[in-house]
Amino acid sequence: MKKIIICLWALIVCCWGCEDYLSVKPSNVQAIRTYDEVKALLGGHLRMYAEPDYDKLAGTSIPYIGSDIWTFLHFYGDDIDVDTYVKNRYIFGNIKNLYVESANWKNTTQPGVIWKVYYTNIGFFNTIIDELSRVEASKEQADIVRCEAKVLRAWHLFKLMQYFSPYHLNKYGLPVNLDAQKVAEYDASRKTQEEVYRIIISDLTECVECTTEPRSTYNVFYDKNIIHAILAQVFLYKGDSGAKADDDYENAASHAKSALEALKLQSTEDYEPFP
C-alpha cells in the first residue's frame, strides 16, 4: 500500500511539473515593436539584391544570382545569348538539360519552386506592410519602407502572371491575398487578369507618384526609373492579354520613355565588347 501511495504521489508531482513546464512563455518569439525593426527586417531581404553573391552571365554584363528561381526566368527572357549561356559552367554542365526541359515546359520541379518561393515572398511583403501600419513612423520613414515592399510585391505578382496565367484568358488570373492577417482564410480562387493587373498597376503607380525621395543608402527597388521600367513591361505584356485595354501600348511607351530619360547611353568611344 505504501508503494502505491508513493507512486501516486510521484505521478501527481510529475503532472504538476509538466503543467508548469508547458505554461512557460516561449522565449524564441521576437515581436516587431518599432519602425527600425520593420525597416531592418525588409533590409535583410534587400541585401540579397544590393550585395548579391553573384557572377555574371556568360557573354553578358547581367548579374547572375546562383538560384534556380533566377535561372528559370533567364530561360524565358530575351536578354541573354542562349547558346552561350547553356554552354557555360553553371550547374556543372547540367544547365543544358535544364534549359531544354524548361523551354519545352517539361521541367517537373520548376512550377512548384516558382509558385512556392514567389508566393512566400509576397506573404513576407504583406507582413512588412502590415507591421509598418502598427508602429510609429513619420510619413517619410513609412514611405521608403512601404514603397519598397509594394514595388517588390507587384513585381512578384507580375512574374507569376507571366508564368501561370493563360495569356489570352481573362478569367484565369491568379489567387491574390494582400492581407497578412488572413493567411489561411482568404479566398484562394483565381481572380481575373483584370483584377490582378489592377492591383499591380495600382501599387506601382502609388509608388512612382510618391513625393518622398528614395534613400540611396536603403532603397533598391523603390527607384522611380525602376518603377517606370516595370510599368512599361506590365503595360506592354498586358497589351495583348485577356485583360488588354486600348491605352496599354501608349502607357507602355510613356513609362519606357520616363525610364530612359535618366539613363545615359553608352557612346561608341566608351563601348567595351564582352570578353
Give the location of each predicted region.
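Membrane-proximal, proline-rich intrinsically disordered regions
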Residues: 18-74, 256
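Short, surface-exposed recognition loops and adjoining beta-strand edges that mediate ligand/DNA contacts
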Residues: 28-33, 67-70, 213-275
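Conserved, well-structured interaction surfaces
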Residues: 88-164, 191-194, 205-215
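Short coil/linker segments at helix-helix boundaries
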Residues: 163-199, 241-250
